[in-house]
Structure formats: structure tokens, C-alpha cells
Amino acid sequence: MGYGDPVDGGSVTRAHAAELDRGDALAGFRDRFEHGDGDRIYVDGNSLGRLSHDARAAVAATVDEWGGRLVTGWHDWVDLAGRTGDALGAAALGAGPGQVLACDSTTVNLYKLAGAALRPRQGAIVVPADDFPTDRYVLEGLAAAHGRELRLVAGDPVAPLGVDAVAAAADGAALVVLSHVNYRSGALADMAAITRAVRSAGSLVLWDLCHSAGAVAVDLDVAGADLAVGCTYKYLNAGPGSPAFLYVAERHQAALRSPIQGWFSQADQFAMGPRYEPAAGIGRFLAGTPPVIGLAAVMAGAGMLAEAGIGAVRAKAAGLTALAVDLHDERLAGLGFTLGTPRAAADRGAHVSLRHPDAWRICRALIEHANVIPDFRRPDSIRLGLPPLYTRYVDVWDAVDRLAALVADGVHERMPEHAARVT
């Protein structure tokens, strides 16, 4: 059962939201997450997912294995980054085996893949001007180190990236780096169309999947993607600082070489030889020792997603965000809010951005006085992250209800004007 028009043809009621929850095919997954927070409404899973019982059990089992097996555990752990990558590829990324690794952080993986892509290719690096800052920072450093132009693509603050604008910027470029889902607006790019356009221009494309993996359908192989990176602590619920992932299409693996050469990517790892020779296949994009305990949580997240099915997850994300959009129009637009997210479900991921001139103080007031946890992004956005595996329709309704009441009563006006370090 998905979200459609209000059942009474008028306002969106809490009873309607509750009816949607009763028909939710994914409802049973909610009980597999920890919710020891009373009446708190958590709508920040786009920053950090909840702890699942599956992840807790997987981590505990791995700790016990460490305690019992000690170093002999490495006979099973040595290939864990690849096995976990294959599980992610199948459940979340539309990637066949041997193309995904779970390792390092998104930032490090971006550096590795972007650096590898630049080595044999000449031309500029292209990135949207409003892309997530770490992507721009890494690419700025690589551009300086390699003597390349960093070409910024301007875009609409709400609408998805336009294919024509990206294609024009890609002309003569070596590498184009794009976010599949924009971290601020939630706008969802057309991966297949943009990939075709970029490749027609002679460039490689690297997709940042941090805000799409585990929330929307991703099909890297079918789209013809070249490279991708992403994190696992948002919609894959693997915990703070959990290992990220990288994807290198099989057709590119032999020609690319990571700029970070480590012993786990050495062709004959335990020969301990004097010279580095990269391993064949996806393993050449590893570096140091994999974080085994963290990978256990990633594997648990991939398993839950595979069980739910990305199609069902995507459908519910569309329904949850549609409810949030309708409630914005009905309850928030008259209080100074504007919608910072595309209205068409096909054009957005699993979070909704609400813009307001006093967004920071409203966000803090929600946390401190209404027991609602969203997050804030400069300059004026409150993001409601709605992970489908544990978010209910009534959670969306209640969060907006508390938000509207708080702003109407001016509670936020008592909050400090200056943002904290963590927003």
C-alpha cells in the first residue's frame, strides 16, 4: 500500500497515515531496530541510521570470533572486503560480483578512484558547485596536484542536475564527479541519461551514492557507470564511521591503478616483496587492513536490504516523502516555509528539505522542545530523512505536526542564533 491522495479528499489526517502503516509491507522491519527513545521521532536517518538488532548481533559475533580465534580468524577475514562488497552490489547497487569493495571512508575511496582515473587521462575535473563539500575538497586537491582545471557546474538549488548542463561541462574533461542524490535538496539525478551523455563526451563518470544507496534503486551495471563511491552509515544502518564502498566497472579495472598502494592490494600480499605490483581485479583498489568488525555491520545492513528488496524500499520512500510534501503544503507553507525538494517522486530520494529563514533555530527547538530529531544544512534547510525500513507514516505526520505547532507558538525564537559545530 502506498501513499496517494488523502482518503477523505481533504486534509491529510493522522488516521490516514495510520491506515497507510497498517498496509505497509515493510512494517515488520521496524521491530528489528532499537527504539529506546520514548516518544522521540527520529527523522535523521539520512545522516546516521538506527542501530538494528541484526547489526548488533553481527558485531557481537565478530568480537567473539576475534576473542576465540585470534589471528587465525584472518583465514576467513582476509577476503571480507570483497565478499561484503559483492553483497552490497547485489542488494543495493545493481552491480555484479567482483566490482565492489567495502573499505576505507567515502573520502579516501573518492581520492583513490578519482586519482586512478586521472593518471592515464588528460583534461579537466568536473563537479557540481553545490556538491557535498568533501567531494569538492578532494577534487580541488587532486586538480592542484595534477595541474588540472576544476570545472564547477552551476545548477538549480532544488531541481535535479540537467543532462545538457553536465554534458556541456564534460566536453574535454577527464573525469566528471556527481552525486546521485543531492545531499541538501534530495534531488535525484538521472544516472543512466547523464552517464550516457558524459561517456559520449569522452569522459569517465564517478557517482557519489551516499544519499541513494539503500534508499533508491541504483543500477550501476545497466546504467553503464564507470566508477562509484558511497557510505554505509545512512540507509544501510552500519553505524557511525562504518566502512564505505567503492565500485569500479570490470572493464576499467586492469587499466586503472590506485594512488594509494598498500599491502592488501599487492598481487602477492604475503610474499612481502621489495616492489609493489597491483593485484588483478577489484582487489587492486584496497589499501590497508580491512576493518573487520565494521564490515560485519555492513554485511548485516546489506542482508536486511536484500530481504526487504530495493523495489519495496524505493516505493515506500516515495510514499513517505510524498506525505511530507503534502503536509508541507498544508501545514507549513503558511508559516514561512518553502519546499527545497523536487515535487515529483521520481526526482527525489528519501529525504525532504524544508527551507526557512530561521531554519537553524527551528531545528534546535525541534530537538530540545519537541523531541524531534532532524538536521540542518546551511544556509536555510531542515532535512527530514525518512529511511523506509523503520520510518512510519505516522512518524512523518507527527513530526510535521510538532514542527507546525512549535513555529506557530514562536518557541524557536528563544533559541540561540548561531549554529553549533555539528548541525
Which residues are covered by each model-predicted region?
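Pyridoxal 5′-phosphate
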Residues: 1-423
